[in-house]
Amino acid sequence: MPAHLDAIDWKILKEMQDDGRITNVELARRVGISAPPCLRRVRALEEAGFIKGYRAVLDEKLLGYEVTVFAMVHLTSQAEPDLKAFEDFVRKEPLVRECWMLSGEIDFVLKCVAPDLKTFQAFVAELTGAPHVRNVKTSLTLRNSKDEAIVPLPAK
């Protein structure tokens, strides 16, 4: 798949992002091509990495995760092995939903969920004791005004 996407590819990406459960037949109808070439295009988009995967979006509150917290982490070292060690630690933590390395004063920001504050406090104690962690500052969320797991696509 070339890096250049044509208008049909963009339509496929938009439709699939809007509804990941769409059938190939319906997708083909919406983008204006027949089913076999539509499926070939979807496979090519997957192989090229434009489509990274498929999953259900779950409601964490209904599943008992009442607390969402952002943790700002400062490390004692920014040497690449130390950064990788911290990232490896975070990948193993089920309460961490996202981990972003930043430029500036904060090295990493983590988006975490927990069933309650006591569970999150226990995680913070573990996080603070992780290798190369200088300090951790947290901010408890009050509400979420926007949560879209989509990529803005240009109108084609």
Predicted regions mapped to residue ranges:
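A compositional/biophysical signature of low hydrophobicity enriched in polar/charged and small residues
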Residues: 1-156
